[in-house]
From Swiss-Prot:
Gene3D superfamilies noted in UniProt: Nucleic acid-binding proteins
Pfam families attached to this UniProt entry: Ribosomal_S17 (PF00366)
GO CC annotations on file: cytosolic small ribosomal subunit
Species classification: Bacteria, Bacillati, Mycoplasmatota, Mollicutes, Acholeplasmatales
Protein name per the record: Small ribosomal subunit protein uS17
GO MF annotation terms: rRNA binding; structural constituent of ribosome
Annotated function: One of the primary rRNA binding proteins, it binds specifically to the 5'-end of 16S ribosomal RNA.
CDD domains assigned: Ribosomal_uS17
Gene: rpsQ
Subunit composition and interactions: Part of the 30S ribosomal subunit.
Organism (species): Onion yellows phytoplasma (strain OY-M)
């Protein structure tokens, strides 16, 4: 299987407390079938971060990979933007 066919997602890092693992939340907007209103749904993913470079608040791009642990099936592909540090 080529890497080009793997699913990619964009999400926001909410936690980096685990070793080489970040938790990313992805927001998806779906249309309600009855009323037609757009409803926001969120899902959390555990993502492998080999170099531990992503921090909470960062916007990241991640992709599918082979199972790395019981809960990790994704790996960090690119950091799109860094979080603004609070001073």
């Amino acid at each position: 299987m080529q890497r080009n066919f793997r699913k990619t997602f964009v999400g926001k890092v909410v936690s980096d407390k685990m070793d080489k693992t970040i938790t990313v939340i992805v927001d998806i907007y779906k249309k309600d079938p009855l009323y037609g209103k757009r409803v926001k749904q969120s899902k959390k993913f555990h993502v492998h971060d080999e170099n531990q470079e992503a921090k909470p608040g960062d916007l990241v791009n991640f992709m599918e990979t082979r199972p790395l642990s019981k809960t990790k099936r994704f790996r960090l592909f690119k950091i799109l933007s860094h979080a603004k540090s609070a001073k």
